Amino acid sequence: MKFGLKDESLRVRHFVTELTGGTGVASLGLHKALVRRGVESRLHYRFGSSNASQVTLDQRHCSRFWRLWGRYVISRRWRQQNPERGIFIHSRWIYPSRLHNFGPTPDVVNLHLVFRWLDLSSFLSSIPEGLPVVWSLHDLHPVTGGCIHPIDCQHFTVHCHDCPNLKRPRKRDCSWHEFNLKDRLYRGLNLHIVGNSEWTTAQARRSALMRHARSFQTIPPGLDTEQFTCVEKSCARQALGVASKKFVVGFCCPDLSDPNKGALMLLESLRALAAEIEMTLLVVGSGKLPAVDGKFEVIKLGTIHSPRLQSVFYSACDVFAVPSRIESFGLTALEAMACGTPVVAFRTGGLTELLVHEETGLLADLAAGAPSLFETLSWMIHHPSERQNMGRAARLRVEREFGASLLAQRYAELYQSLTASTHLGDGRS
């Protein structure tokens, strides 16, 4: 019988490009939960800041030359993309990175979103043979030739080419070369895939690149429910300068202009709703929101990183909207639920697993677009009692199924199973 390492003996290194955005928040939350559990976890990152223990900023190549060179490469690659479709991400970066650059070899390497920091070619090639590599999928970039979400493109299931995310797609375009590179790098890795939803895991299994994966798991993100908590609505609104009697819809995403996040459909729905009730759109995020014609109030709060301030934002809302065309999970929806706010979203991706329709929120029909979103929001307006019950049920669901301790337990059990054979002969138990 094989036994893995005990929690306190596990040495795990996490890698994530930045600590902001859904991926950064989820990665840092996992690391903190593992540390509380006793796992020797260390997280490495390139952008952002944190005062959490065992979190290390990569300070290599921080000179002005490397910053300017990085910006130039990003802008050049950006010009190759089709902005209406979504971003295209390259696996190579401007300088090499190797596992030994970050300290002693751990028992497990856990990758998150690492583009524009870790050069995959040099980094994956530096990992010792047999060392378990867990790749936590926050999107589908690791399993495609460059896109974050294939949407209706099926090329990743065979071999990427003619990529719709590129301005000039062709048979042997960037996606074809990227797919070849990943196929070569994944071959021979002790690779284990963890999807943040069953939907994400199912999509990963469909990728031709994932024939190299040794196992597939689904572990949804978790939250510290003592930090993300319900705030008295009247107090939250007073703190944010929101009128107490208005119907408040919340919306949050890192880039408000990202077409995938659905701001245009949300605004179209709210214009129609403004004829029914006095309302406010409360917005968190950076970037430019599409023009609003003044039929309803818009309050932009900018970017908020503090969970306690985020709790104030979510608690001030009557309903939180996630009008994305696709979401692998929907971390902002989870955060809103933890604060007792019901969620309205499209029936797409991992959102269908997170939200329980008519219990913790409502799911609109993506194919119907803005009219369906309008109907669900209108129902929320005219059913205040049911809406409040949904908010309470949402909080209970997060406490029961998405707590940080449960997240750490699931990952620790995975690490233990992967290290069972690795350390059989080294005297550790």
Kindly label every feature range from the protein language model:
Residues 144-148, 169-216, 223-233:
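A short, active-site helix/loop in glycosyltransferases that binds the activated sugar's phosphate group
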Residues 243-261, 267-270:
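Conserved donor-binding/catalytic core segment of Leloir-type glycosyltransferases
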Residues 285-308:
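Nucleotide-activated donor-binding/catalytic signature segment of Leloir-type glycosyltransferases, i.e.
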Residues 312-317:
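Short alpha-helical donor nucleotide-sugar binding micro-motif in glycosyltransferases
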Residues 325:
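Aromatic "clamp/platform" in nucleotide-sugar-dependent glycosyltransferases that forms part
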Residues 342-345, 355:
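Short hydrophobic beta-strand element within catalytic cores of glycosyltransferases
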Residues 379, 386-401, 407-413:
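A short, well-ordered alpha-helix in the C-terminal region of glycosyltransferases
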